[in-house]
Design a protein with these regions (language model features):
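Active-site-proximal helix-loop-helix substrate-binding element of RNase H-like nuclease domains
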Residues: 148-152, 157-161, 167-170, 174, ...
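Short, basic/hydrophobic alpha-helical segments
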Residues: 81-92, 225-229, 274-290
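A polyanion-binding, active-site-adjacent surface
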Residues: 1-199
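Short conserved beta-strand segments at catalytic cores or DNA/RNA-binding microdomains
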Residues: 20, 49, 241, 251-259
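Short hydrophobic beta-strand that contains or immediately precedes a catalytic carboxylate
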Residues: 16-18, 238-241, 295, 316-317
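Short acidic, glycine-rich loop/turn motifs
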Residues: 132, 142-144, 254-258, 357
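Short glycine-rich phosphate-binding loop at a beta-alpha junction
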Residues: 94-99, 239, 291-299
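DnaQ-like (DEDDh/DEDDy) 3′-5′ exonuclease domain used for proofreading
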Residues: 11-13, 188-238, 246
Length: 389
């Protein structure tokens, strides 16, 4: 058993760098993040964003080097939970950088000893407010009158190093790095810039996104919202998205801003057939109208809509295609684009986390569809701006 590596940095630092467990160099020097991955983190990724080590408090969820340097070999996981929570909660914090999936899981599940881990590649870059943390983590951070602490998950620098050649000198020679290595590093640098903006107060929490659907609105309210969309200026872009189950459309969503969406379920049992037909006609008129349309991999949606007689006119921008032109080295799925071009935290787990007895066409399914529309609209507008620069 090795000696514990204690936290390092100002006890009242506004930024916490929460790692997983120390490596060989950290154990030898009894200081966090001094090995190759720590140097990559502090000397390059955070330094380029203007974040200096002396302004952060660095610590781990497990303070001892694992046997064989593998997390799976730790027999006393959870041993340092109380010490970690006490350290984090000793002073108000602006940002906790959760470095790697074990650090993220600690914040969200409340212990280093967790049954399942959250996938860091999915959650990285998300602005997670403290009300989403585990109850014991929230309690540790509870300061009367202080602003909520934000956590930003980041891919572990060791993953950057493993996925491609690592240029420790920082001279920019990435000729030997594979595609994953390049985009992992780009994502870490993007997230570091976001963290700096949070600390400086330049960005705040994500906007509230309102999704109208059959679970929270009456039929007449949805009908009126669609009519208002039809009456809007035809120059305002409209994002659209569908959800399918077994090759059948379950709902159709539209949004004319990043904060408001309307979802028409095709499976709502409380509506009469004539009401269902009217709303489908309404949304068909919206999609066939003159407004520019935004979609994500929209060929899929357009083909499914065509099968039920809904045309999509004036297609303006496919967010996946636009992003592939601008940044071919980075994946182009909507979760990735959401993390890069909006402040919306990762929400794709809504498809996986629905209640067992909730049908595929329930309220969570509809809200998920509406969020897709809102973020697609926001991503599309930001990509359009970027392409024009």
């Amino acid at each position: 058993m090795t000696a514990p590596v204690n936290p390092d940095g100002p006890p009242d630092a506004e930024i916490i760098c929460l790692g997983e467990a120390p490596g060989k160099e950290e154990a030898e020097e009894s200081r966090p993040f001094v090995g190759p991955s720590g140097r990559l983190l502090y000397d390059q990724i955070l330094a380029r964003a203007g974040i200096r080590r002396e302004h952060t408090l660095a610590l781990y969820t497990h303070w001892e080097m694992p046997s064989g340097r593998k997390w799976e070999t730790i027999s006393n996981l959870g041993k340092y939970d109380e010490s970690t929570l006490k350290t984090i909660g000793a002073h108000p914090r602006k940002v906790i950088i959760a470095i790697g999936e074990h650090a993220l899981s600690f914040l969200m599940q409340g212990s280093a000893k967790t049954a399942g881990r959250l996938e860091i590649v999915k959650w990285r870059g998300s602005m997670l407010t403290s009300n989403r943390f585990a109850a014991n983590v929230q309690a540790a951070l509870a300061f009367t009158g202080s602003a909520p602490t934000i956590a930003v998950p980041m891919i572990h620098p060791e993953s950057v190093m493993r996925s491609g050649e690592y240029d420790e000198a920082g001279i920019g020679d990435d000729s030997g790095a594979d595609r994953k290595g390049l985009h992992y590093r780009s994502l870490c640098e993007h997230d570091a810039k976001r963290i700096k903006q949070i600390v400086e107060g330049k960005i705040e929490t994500p906007p509230e996104r309102q999704v109208m659907h059959a679970g929270n609105c009456s039929y007449s309210a949805i009908d009126m919202a669609l009519e208002n969309l039809l009456n809007e200026n035809g120059n305002t872009p409209i994002a659209f998205d569908i959800e399918t189950f077994s090759h059948t459309i379950t709902c159709i969503g539209v949004a004319s801003s990043g904060t408001d969406a309307v979802v028409v379920p095709l499976t709502e049992v409380s509506w009469t057939r004539s009401q269902q037909v009217k709303l489908i006609d309404r949304i068909a008129d919206v999609l066939d109208g003159p407004a520019p349309k935004i979609g994500q991999h929209l060929d899929y949606d357009v083909q499914h809509l065509a099968r039920i007689g809904i045309p999509v006119r004036n297609v303006w921008l496919d967010t996946a295609v636009a992003h592939s032109i601008l940044h071919p080295e980075i994946p182009h799925d909507l979760a990735m684009l959401t993390s890069l071009y909006t402040l919306e935290p990762y929400f794709k787990n809504m498809r996986e986390d629905k209640e067992v007895d909730e049908p595929i066409y329930g309220a969570q399914h509809w809200r998920y569809n509406g969020l897709d529309c809102c973020v697609t609209w926001e991503v599309g507008m930001n990509l359009d701006w970027e392409m024009r620069q």
